[in-house]
Amino acid sequence: MLVSSNVTMQFGSKPLFENISVKFGGGNRYGLIGANGSGKSTFMKILGGDLEPTLGNVSLDPNERIGKLRQDQFAFEEFTVLDTVIMGHKELWEVKQERDRIYALPEMSEEDGYKVADLEVKYGEMDGYSAEARAGELLLGVGIPVEQHYGPMSEVAPGWKLRVLLAQALFADPDILLLDEPTNNLDIDTIRWLEQVLNERDSTMIIISHDRHFLNMVCTHMADLDYGELRVYPGNYDEYMTAATQARERLLADNAKKKAQIAELQSFVSRFSANASKSRQATSRARQIDKIKLEEVKASSRQNPFIRFEQDKKLFRNALEVEGLTKGFDNGPLFKNLNLLLEVGEKLAVLGTNGVGKSTLLKTLVGDLQPDSGTVKWSENARIGYYAQDHEYEFENDLTVFEWMSQWKQEGDDEQAVRSILGRLLFSQDDIKKPAKVLSGGEKGRMLFGKLMMQKPNILIMDEPTNHLDMESIESLNMALELYQGTLIFVSHDREFVSSLATRILEITPERVIDFSGNYEDYLRSKGIE
């Protein structure tokens, strides 16, 4: 069991959170949730021993092991991929290292012989003889091919290194497992594999994720970090949302009743306190008022941006016609002879494993990349709004937030229209004076949504738009795209996002491109996957 006792973390004058006392155990899987900036990752670092709290402490049962998903993807460059995974089990790795050292000696002393015999017993008890096989299986699960297993980590591409570190955390199979954003950099199929692996484990887990479907599939409890406090609810994310909403509504309703009661008593006191015959009753009611205590309703750190995408000019019939489209690089074509006819109003989800060509397809459709062959023909009146996955180039100038958004004013827009958009997207009057380039990833994402709101395109193309967003922004974006009347083409690894939006699926595989008319759940059923 992992226990936090009166944990407080303070940066500057205001505490990030305070007096958190909670027990994590029993093989439960806790989803640690809260708005960006509420302190989730900070609290996770404190639980893992990587950060000292301002006050309080964290204790782990002495016979239990703790494991965690590391974020330092360049820390193992000189090790093989397989060894990096095995290093997740610290005790096993240390025994293996000492055992290998003794066997590598030119001559083994009698003392070395006794020592290595003891090490062999420990190695066997920790299933060391199957370590490479188990590590290899996990690497295949996260998408690392066999030919890379014995190579150095330095040859694994950034992003994919994080997959190796996920395999490392899973290999540890500890009593307590801490996972901070384990689905980052994973495609939708690998996330489904991870859900199955975690559900088969007996470890107590604490998981930070913005993937609602993942939290629903894996978590048995939700730990909500809000109001500077931590509250634990039984159930998955959807069940938590219902329970938390009902609890807050009950609190507000109880306070409303108490306020009405106070007002009624106060009215009596005001009318009759000077009346000699009723002064005792007035005094009694005044005492009743003193006894009524309103529950404190703290301001939530959660805020939902207001996102709505409108069309300036509607299209009719076909939005896009693609014929014989082929695009590749030095290693050959990513997709070949792709034909696609997209009708107005369709919402097309482009799926596939990482590196298969999803972003390349979108870049080719918008003209950022030229096809090797084939044609891309948009409707004559198409007005395209594009959200690129890598959009840092849009923020390289020195414009303030207000100046940056003002670039996208349309005919008839004034300064107030820009301020209105920024306000809906949760940027304060102080925020809009900041340089846009210093904004966080989530804030830059909201800025790009504002750009698209001002442009009023009739076709939206979005490449991983939920990256860096908090849960509230994801849900607001999800609703905005559900209400959008135009045509949508998007890439996402968020299962809930894809399931709720897609009316058509385009899956790119190394062998072919699959075009399926229907939603994602229907597509999975067509493949025999539930």
UniProtKB/Swiss-Prot annotation:
A Pfam family that the UniProt record links to this protein: ABC_tran_Xtn
Record GO terms (molecular function): ATP binding; ATP hydrolysis activity
Domain ABC transporter: 2-252, 320-526
Changes seen on gene knockout: No visible growth or ribosome-associated phenotype.
Xref: SMART domains: AAA
Outcome recorded upon mutating E464Q: Causes growth defect at 18 degrees Celsius in bipA deletion strain
UniProt keyword list: ATP-binding, Nucleotide-binding, Repeat
Matches recorded under SUPFAM superfamilies: P-loop containing nucleoside triphosphate hydrolases
Record-listed ATP 2 binding positions: G352, T353, N354, G355, V356, G357, K358, S359
Binding sites annotated in the UniProt record for ATP 1: G34, A35, N36, G37, S38, G39, K40, S41
Coiled-coil zones: none
Protein family membership: Belongs to the ABC transporter superfamily. ABCF family. YbiT subfamily.
Protein name: Probable ATP-binding protein YbiT
Taxonomic lineage from the root: Bacteria, Pseudomonadati, Pseudomonadota, Gammaproteobacteria, Enterobacterales
